[in-house]
Amino acid sequence: MMREVYICDAIRTPIGRFGGGLSTVRADDLAALPIKALIERNPSVDWSAVDEVFLGCANQAGEDNRNVARMALLLAGLPESIPGVTLNRLCASGMDAIGTAFRAIASGEMELAIAGGVESMSRAPFVMGKADAAFSRNMKLEDTTIGWRFINPLMKAQYGVDAMPQTADNVADDYQVSRADQDAFALRSQQRTAAAQAAGFFAEEIVPVRVAHKKGETLVERDEHPRDTTLEALAKLKPVNGADKTVTAGNASGVNDGAAALILASAEAVKQHGLTARARVLGMASAGVAPRVMGIGPVPAVRKLVERLGLAVTDFDVIELNEAFASQGLAVLRELGIADDAPQVNPNGGAIALGHPLGMSGARLVMTALHQLEKTGGRKGLATMCVGVGQGLALAIERV
């Protein structure tokens, strides 16, 4: 029989703009910050009892190489005896880390774990593959910030290798999502995030980051990506994929930096370490879709999860849907029978306003859902997101 698994604490860094306040911080140092914050916030815990640290990270081609989870836990001050593993489900890596920890504890294999994710897209390197032959002049430099690199010709022939904005336009075309609706969705995200920031909502989940530089140091304590915009300003932006398309920089998520970490524990570990159970993890489900419309992935993932749990989408008091693109966000909501402007969906804005540090975002969605449930007294929360190469992931929690 599966055991109950609890989220006991959750913290993250601010989300930095591309080239912004966190751009000089290495990914391993960035990932260590929320782990260290968890240690400081929970002095009653015997940290030598942590069974594993699970961190999501999508890139792993630069300073986040060689198992960034292990690097981060050591840099954070956890004992050398604690193992760590880095998971990669691209955009959903941080959520997958939470789900993997949940399953390990629920099965009885583990009692106490840290899970989360990290991404420094500002510091993503350029990489070059090795030559296929001596004196080759066909060397190619690849940008690892986001999207395809070192493309497999068979993959391209069978499925296509559309860039992320193209997949979003594919969804807009297939599901008839207009430019006007996308821009309205994007504006709502910005407005809700601005209101949440003004109310201090995100301060509860953020650990400020001190960034050293030549002139001293800077304290980064707020998410940097939100923009003050209008429908008129959004309407003036040119489509990324040509005049007849609808996806723009304004109705898409950002390229960002950030890290997050959560404590997950069994009921026994909660008592043993003096923790407070804040939410119960109910389950996680994944699903695959055509890579060319990867943005629709949350639909089958959510349907699979709610069927498994015996719930309906209407049972959730808050839904954190990752806003990779407004087009896919709207298509997902409509397929699930949810209104475009439903108040329970991203009530504090989403990735269009906050940003989308790939490996961190899934963990951010879960903790933001938790904080919203605690703020409003709601019971059940759902976090879901699309994944590059055609997948969806969904995870449900219940406040205790």
Regions found by a protein language model. Name each.
Residues 25, 57-113, 142-148, 158-164, ...:
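Conserved catalytic cysteine-centered active-site region
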Residues 12-13, 23-24, 28-33, 44, ...:
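N-terminal extracellular/periplasmic Venus flytrap/periplasmic-binding protein-like
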Residues 1-76, 167-179, 196, 289, ...:
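Conserved active-site "lid/cap" helical segment
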